[in-house]
């Protein structure tokens, strides 16, 4: 008898509590600020592709869902001939974004990627490229890569050791 009354009392109290479940298609869930969702390829401020096809993203991917092939344009600038991500295998770990030296790969808060056909989850470069610069609007890899710091020689920058002659290390 006591257990039945206790159960009814708990049910009565729960009637006035806020519901935990949200009605998903009608109400959108609150996404955390650092949510790792759909992967995109961004462009630099000049409108060119940021990706230099260095294969670091494919090497960092633990499930091997990234495939790309490098090629060069007439200015000897590398870019991916094709860039393919299989989202049916992707675990959205973000290692590819961390490994990318040019900030070309970025993860967006988009999480609605449900498909009826698994083949539709293989995204090509055209599906991944966006028109804008993404999270880093002023960054252009080719403006800062290999550029000497003004007024300082090699090894003269802060926390930088002077260059080592490899022949001096030989016995």
UniProtKB/Swiss-Prot annotation:
Pfam families: Fer4_7
PROSITE patterns: 4FE4S_FER_1 (PS00198), 4FE4S_FER_2 (PS51379)
EC top class, as a word: translocase
Catalytic activity of the protein: a quinone + NADH + 5 H(+)(in) = a quinol + NAD(+) + 4 H(+)(out)
Keyword Zinc: no
Residues reported to bind [4Fe-4S] cluster 1: 51, 54, 57, 100
Gene3D superfamilies found in the cross-reference section: 3.30.70.3270
Any single Gene Ontology cellular-component annotation: plasma membrane
GO BP term (any one): aerobic respiration
Membrane topology note: Peripheral membrane protein
Residues given in the record as [4Fe-4S] cluster 2 binding sites: 61, 90, 93, 96
Cofactor note: Binds 2 [4Fe-4S] clusters per subunit.
4Fe-4S ferredoxin-type domain ranges (all copies): 41-71, 81-110
PANTHER family on file: NADH DEHYDROGENASE [UBIQUINONE] IRON-SULFUR PROTEIN 8, MITOCHONDRIAL (PTHR10849:SF20), NADH DEHYDROGENASE UBIQUINONE IRON-SULFUR PROTEIN 8, MITOCHONDRIAL (PTHR10849)
Summary of the function given for this chain in its UniProt record: NDH-1 shuttles electrons from NADH, via FMN and iron-sulfur (Fe-S) centers, to quinones in the respiratory chain. The immediate electron acceptor for the enzyme in this species is believed to be ubiquinone. Couples the redox reaction to proton translocation (for every two electrons transferred, four hydrogen ions are translocated across the cytoplasmic membrane), and thus conserves the redox energy in a proton gradient.
Name the UniProt record assigns to this protein: NADH-quinone oxidoreductase subunit I 1
Species assigned in the record: Nitrosospira multiformis (strain ATCC 25196 / NCIMB 11849 / C 71)
Name of the gene this protein is made from: nuoI1
């Amino acid at each position: 008898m006591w257990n039945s009354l206790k159960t009814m009392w708990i049910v009565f109290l729960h009637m006035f509590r806020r519901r935990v479940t949200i009605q998903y298609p009608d109400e959108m869930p609150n996404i955390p600020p650092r949510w790792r969702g759909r992967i995109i390829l961004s462009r630099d401020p000049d409108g060119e592709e940021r990706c230099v096809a260095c294969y670091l993203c494919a090497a960092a991917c633990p499930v091997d869902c990234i495939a790309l092939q490098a090629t060069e344009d007439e200015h000897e600038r590398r870019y991916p001939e094709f860039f393919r991500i299989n989202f049916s295998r992707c675990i959205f770990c973000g290692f590819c974004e961390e490994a990318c030296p040019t900030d070309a790969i970025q993860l967006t808060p988009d999480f609605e990627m449900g498909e009826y056909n698994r083949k539709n989850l293989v995204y090509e470069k055209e599906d991944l490229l966006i028109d804008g610069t993404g999270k880093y609007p002023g960054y252009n890899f080719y403006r800062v890569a290999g550029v000497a710091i003004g007024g300082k020689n090699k090894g003269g920058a802060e926390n930088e050791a002077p260059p080592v002659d490899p022949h001096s290390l030989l016995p």
